[in-house]
Amino acid sequence: MVLPPVHVRVARLPRLAPRGAWHASAATTLALHLRAGVRAARFSARAASVPMERRRLLLVSNSTLHGGGYLDHCQEHIRNFLGAKVKSVLFVPYALHDRIAYAKMAREKFESLGYGLDSIHESLDPGEAVRKAEAIFIGGGNTFRLLKALYDNGLIQPIRKRVLEDGVPYIGSSAGTNVATISISTTNDMPIVYPPSLLALGLVSFNINPHYLDPDVNSTHMGETREKRILQYHEEPDTPPVLGLREGSLLLVEGNKATLQGKTGARLFVRGCDPTEHAVGADFSFLLKEDAKKP
């Protein structure tokens, strides 16, 4: 699919400060972000041509479950997913500010499971680290910060290639699960930084809302519920399904098969349909098809 050229006219910025570097910088940044978004859209349009038979993903809603430690609730899933063949995991800590402390925590956990862990922030060449990785784990934190770092380091296409073409196992937790999907449009996080595009890795053809929270019928809080926000997202045209993963749940994707695992169920939102409940063990393989609808 070849998209036509997109011509963007950057509007003149309001005079909020003296003319000078700020205006030029802001206009330049806006133009670059718009052009990057167009490039990402063209890249996404080609995704359907990539074979998915080798794809292996473990998409976890949350890293820590109430009453437990870091990755405790899913550690057996991780061990079964990686198996004995993988010896070391490449960790991507970009979602948190303190990457050193984050990598230390992740390393201690994976070493307790029998795996080595190298953090990508310690590498002089992040792209080369991805190309050599036996497995990739992207941790949680702020999804906007994470996606911006992936774009800034030129890692979107290298990670896609390793996972979709080379069959390298991918583990995502929270924000790491968000960026595995088509876009981060349904994240819960604040946009504290601005990635060039909301389009993400596109390892699956739908969106996920990690930490999905059911409405509290006894609450007096007047803010929008998670469900209302997702329904607002689906008021926009051509928006993909959204899988609300409750804390304690995870999605295992092997090739063209997707299965809900963990301790809790999930809630599925498909544009134009009522939300549906799904228990652990549910088969979500139909979501992996382009233009997925209810089975």
Regions found by a protein language model. Give the residues of each.
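Catalytic-core regions built around general acid/base machinery
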Residues: 153-167
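Short glycine-rich anion-binding loops that position phosphate/pyrophosphate groups of nucleotides
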Residues: 63, 141-144, 176, 213
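N-terminal chloroplast transit peptides
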Residues: 1-33
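C-terminal and late-domain segments of enzyme folds
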Residues: 2, 48-85, 97-104, 108, ...
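Catalytic nucleophile loop
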Residues: 137-140, 163-183
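Glycine/threonine-rich flexible loop motifs
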Residues: 143-153, 219
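A glycine-rich, hydrophobic loop/mini-helix early in the fold
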Residues: 92-93, 97-143
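Short internal beta-strands
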Residues: 90-93, 208
